[in-house]
Amino acid sequence: MESSRVVVGGGLPLANRRNSSFAKPKIQQGTFLPLSRINNVSAPQKCSLHTNPNPMFPFVTRRKSQTNPDCGVVKLGEEDDSCSSLDKLPEVNGVHTGVARPVDIKRELVMLSLPAIAGQAIDPLTLLMETAYIGRLGSVELGSAGVSMAIFNTISKLFNIPLLSVATSFVAEDIAKIAAQDLASEDSQSDIPSQGLPERKQLSSVSTALVLAIGIGIFEALALSLASGPFLRLMGIQSMSEMFIPARQFLVLRALGAPAYVVSLALQGIFRGFKDTKTPVYCLGIGNFLAVFLFPLFIYKFRMGVAGAAISSVISQYTVAILMLILLNKRVILLPPKIGSLKFGDYLKSGGFVLGRTLSVLVTMTVATSMAARQGVFAMAAHQICMQVWLAVSLLTDALASSGQALIASSASKRDFEGVKEVTTFVLKIGVVTGIALAIVLGMSFSSIAGLFSKDPEVLRIVRKGVLFVAATQPITALAFIFDGLHYGMSDFPYAACSMMVVGGISSAFMLYAPAGLGLSGVWVGLSMFMGLRMVAGFSRLMWRKGPWWFMHTSDKRLA
């Protein structure tokens, strides 16, 4: 969903120490170049290489592929020939800079995207399986579960996406600070290179994220359980509706898993801060495989219906959270010795803009579901099928956006604007190709896919009308997600939040009135408008000459 967008910390890159007095500056402890310092730059700054022990940008480079699998901290090593390393760096006016350019942007992007795609695909695919199993129970069950899922996602993800993004950034910054401190200590004592974080560390960012996740999860569970009736009525499901009882039962049971769900998302952000994307994928795979195994057992074998589906999901969520906590406990101390070491203020401040943006997205999607529910049982069931397929496929492009975001954040923190331009251009091209490919595949197979979710002829008839919405909008959706990732990589959170509020307001207003004359098609047109306006807003920001993307309109020579 929206998928969550990941912000990589803007810490100063660690680097290889050299056997040359010319290329061995003393790294100042805790020196970093956050993205916020370059976000509103209007012109490039020139810098030269000199022997000043306190240069503006210490002359440091990063060894290729030398990462610690345990925590993602760069390992330092010796270079036999500092002069040969100088040749590998780009030049500024004939002088080597301290910015190491990626050897192969395309390969690096692909390697980052593969685990991200796997992680993004697991939850939506499991949700598709759940929808398919529930759909075989009947249209009433499918429609009621669809409304309850929308409510659960709206409430639970309201704070989850900001928490995930901010946790990633803060954890990465904490790791970089500790590594810099260790390096400074070693420089004053010996020539033995740092090996990252070999032992458990106390990271306030990790502890704060976990405490916030637990508190938010408990609050969400209570809110969803105690206010299930009002939430359903707000979505258009009245007490006399045949969908009310199964929808309320499903929502109350799913609420029990809210704490685990929030904690697991926060843990994913923490592991990404450690630059470890494999561990979350393994844990998500185990938990979701368990859910897929339990769905038919509880729904059909034990004849629990939608309640069985909800219980299966709750068991899966707690399994994922527990596995991640066990593995994280091997790396860091989970809870701080004193409450004063937690930094709630930093989290709340940094997550404010992301929260506003997330709220705008969720409100728009909630309006769409609410207006679809008002069209009747068959229309709501068809809308649920279209939405699940659309979200599951479009989230795959979100993984590409997250990978591009990571590369952009890394290059921008080093003021490597040529690298940012290269990543941006390549990611946008891949986004267009991916969107067109998905549109073709879905256009040819969507009718067959719909049959997996329901056998009701009336539901299938309505679903076939949604082919244009699901398939044709894929190129637009792909670019909308990618633009979000690009702006997050440049830490352009204010624009991301404000533009989303405007886009969401326009789309929601359209969907509130269009269904009166267009029916369910009015909802789908409104959602297509939502993604189209997001794409336009993202592209417009890229074209601003005085914004954070000023360098996109500057020649390579001027950047140099």
UniProtKB/Swiss-Prot annotation:
TM ranges: 109-129, 147-167, 209-229, 250-270, 280-300, 308-328, 353-373, 389-411, 426-446, 466-486, 495-515, 523-543
Transit peptide, UniProt annotation: 1-75
Induction: Not induced by aluminum.
Membrane-related topology note: Multi-pass membrane protein
A Pfam match: MatE
Keyword Ribonucleoprotein applies: no
Stated name of the protein: Protein DETOXIFICATION 45, chloroplastic
Gene expressing this chain: DTX45
